[in-house]
Amino acid sequence: MAKRKANHVIPGMNAAKAQGMGAGYNEKFSNEPLTEAQRQNNKKRKKNQ
């Protein structure tokens, strides 16, 4: 039998989707004002949502 890949992780898409939006980055900074560097970094996330 062929080994099957997990269907919920689609290559080419954001792999973190499998863990839900609460995993990592978003949760960490959600209640603090962003520094300038983080704000620059955040533009990419906003576009994806």
Curated annotation (Swiss-Prot):
InterPro entries: SASP_SspO (IPR012613). Residues 23-49 are annotated as: Disordered. The keyword Lipid metabolism does not apply. Keywords: Sporulation. It comes from the Bacteria. It is found in: Spore core. GO terms for cellular component: endospore-forming forespore. Signal peptide: none annotated. Pfam families: SspO (PF08175). GO terms for biological process: asexual sporulation; sporulation resulting in formation of a cellular spore. Induction: Expressed only in the forespore compartment of sporulating cells. Belongs to the SspO family. This is Small, acid-soluble spore protein O. It comes from Geobacillus thermodenitrificans (strain NG80-2).
